[in-house]
């Protein structure tokens, strides 16, 4: 952990004599600390517990003040394991919130919640730090210009386009491909836009965090030879961390992204995987602090905690932070308070469907459930809007006809409906796409499809020009020309078999 030089002089060493306290109670990750009268730390101040455990090993545990209890006591939440701590150990008030390194030196590195590098590449070469607790930008600083953020993923760009400087939610249950989609977005945006990304791994699997790091090194997003040329900083607070760390790691990642926006004046991508774990950690901490639970056992401060994080993610006149947040949906229930609270802050939602994943259509983005406030003619243009609406209408009609097809069969439909079903099935398959990050598993090279190409492809399917092509030709291809080439290849293979 860094100490913010602007607020705390030369760091912990000068504070030792000024404001030491003592641990008086430890309950799991929650510590009660007594301080001398008149020297109470502020809420959110970082405390450091120093001492030695039973075998003489040094202990250095950082905590964050959450409650002032009276009788010169505070209640703090630990950011790391509390094994080995005992009552009576010395606690130092740093006089400032947790502060983390920011700037170009963070790129290509992995940090924990305290801003300490955990990638075995040595200390971070920067003296610039920033506190993780800040207020959102003032209204007068905000930028209100509307523009699309092209991702190169067909289903996203056509049906639920992302806003530059907006907030996007990736909704889906376990195992439907949220993290793979996030990895593809980091890859595409780094390569196509030259953008800087910050990835906050909040309460997810350590294995996934490691896989993501290795994948980024392979794809060149993290440059091992010249680490300064990397395009992403990683901040991890994984499942095995105490709830305090998981609750604050999102703020650490956001603080790093804010520096790129406000000081370097860049457009930044902030990925949070998973925002539900941020809520879950807050719920654990709330219970440990003795607060009365609210609906479904969540913390009573759920909306406030979510708002304090989300309102800092915005576009200013200096730069923008576009945030893509994976949202685990408990039991696939979108009315659960955690995903429902998240919805209120989002400009677009990308909903992943278990049904599509079961069919083998990846990315398994549900074209009818996914939404975007950007899909308006005055923003995306008439051509894009009309194409998207016709695609949705075709898929909606196909969905309505599926019960009839299941009971009576395809032959009982009218000629017009049979044609519509054939086109809908082609559209459904054409919405799939091979990913760069999945090349290792599938053997198919990844494809980046520009928005103009995407619109052209779907217009050709809707117009009926490609009615003669088999539907499997549209599965896992990039643009429409590849689908046509695949159809010719399939026809040749079929003729050879005959």
From Swiss-Prot:
Organism of derivation: Nicotiana rustica (Aztec tobacco)
Quaternary structure and interacting proteins, as annotated: F-type ATPases have 2 components, CF(1) - the catalytic core - and CF(0) - the membrane proton channel. CF(1) has five subunits: alpha(3), beta(3), gamma(1), delta(1), epsilon(1). CF(0) has four main subunits: a(1), b(1), b'(1) and c(9-12).
Organism superkingdom: Eukaryota
Enzyme Commission code(s) on record: 7.1.2.2
UniProt keyword Disulfide bond present: no
UniProt entry keywords in alphabetical sequence: ATP synthesis, ATP-binding, CF(1), Chloroplast, Hydrogen ion transport, Ion transport, Membrane, Nucleotide-binding, Plastid, Thylakoid, Translocase, Transport
Source taxonomy: Eukaryota, Viridiplantae, Streptophyta, Embryophyta, Tracheophyta
Coiled-coil stretches: none
Protein name in UniProt: ATP synthase subunit beta, chloroplastic
GO cellular component terms given for this protein: chloroplast thylakoid membrane; mitochondrion; proton-transporting ATP synthase complex
């Amino acid at each position: 952990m860094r100490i913010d030089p602007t607020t705390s002089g030369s760091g912990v060493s000068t504070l030792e004599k000024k404001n030491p306290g003592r641990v008086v109670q430890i309950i799991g990750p929650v510590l009660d600390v007594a301080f001398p009268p008149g020297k109470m730390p502020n809420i959110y101040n970082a405390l450091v517990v120093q001492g030695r455990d039973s075998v003489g090993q040094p202990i250095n545990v950082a905590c964050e003040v959450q409650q002032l209890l009276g009788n010169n006591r505070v209640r703090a939440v630990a950011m790391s394991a509390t094994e080995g701590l005992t009552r009576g150990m010395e606690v130092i008030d740093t006089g400032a919130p947790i502060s983390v390194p920011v700037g170009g030196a963070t790129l290509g590195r992995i940090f924990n919640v305290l801003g300490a590098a955990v990638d075995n590449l040595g200390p971070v070469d920067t003296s610039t730090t920033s506190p993780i607790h800040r207020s959102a930008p003032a209204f007068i600083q905000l930028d209100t210009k509307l523009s699309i953020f092209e991702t190169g993923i067909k289903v996203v760009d056509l049906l639920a386009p992302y806003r530059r400087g907006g907030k996007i939610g990736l909704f889906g249950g376990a195992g439907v491909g949220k993290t793979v989609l996030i990895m593809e977005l980091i890859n595409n945006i780094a390569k196509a836009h030259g953008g800087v990304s910050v990835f906050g791994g909040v309460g997810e699997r350590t294995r996934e965090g490691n896989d993501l790091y290795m994948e980024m090194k392979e794809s060149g997003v993290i440059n091992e030879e010249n680490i300064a040329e990397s395009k992403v900083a990683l901040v991890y607070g994984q499942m095995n961390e105490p709830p305090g760390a998981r609750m604050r790691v999102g703020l650490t990642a956001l603080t790093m992204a804010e520096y790129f926006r406000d000081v370097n004046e860049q457009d930044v991508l902030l990925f949070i995987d998973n925002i539900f774990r941020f809520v879950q950690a807050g719920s654990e901490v709330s219970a440990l602090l003795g607060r009365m639970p609210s609906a479904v056992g969540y913390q009573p401060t759920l909306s406030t905690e979510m708002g304090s994080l989300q309102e800092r993610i915005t576009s200013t006149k200096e730069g923008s932070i576009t945030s893509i947040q994976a949202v685990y949906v408990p039991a696939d229930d979108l009315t659960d308070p955690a995903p429902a609270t998240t919805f209120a802050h989002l400009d677009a939602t990308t909903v992943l469907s278990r049904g599509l994943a079961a069919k083998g259509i990846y990315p398994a983005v549900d074209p009818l459930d996914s939404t975007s406030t950007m899909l308006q003619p005055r923003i995306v243009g008439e051509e894009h809007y009309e194409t998207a609406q016709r695609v949705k209408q075709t898929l909606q009609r196909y969905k309505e006809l599926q019960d009839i097809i299941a009971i009576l069969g395809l032959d009982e439909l009218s000629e017009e409906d049979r044609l519509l079903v054939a086109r809908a099935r082609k559209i459904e398959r054409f919405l799939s796409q091979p990913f760069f990050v999945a090349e290792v598993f599938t053997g198919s090279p990844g494809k980046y499809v520009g928005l103009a190409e995407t619109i052209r492809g779907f217009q050709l399917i809707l117009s009926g020009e490609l009615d003669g092509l088999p539907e499997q030709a549209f599965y896992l291809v990039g643009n429409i020309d590849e689908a046509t080439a695949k159809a010719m290849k399939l026809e040749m293979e079929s003729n050879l078999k005959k």
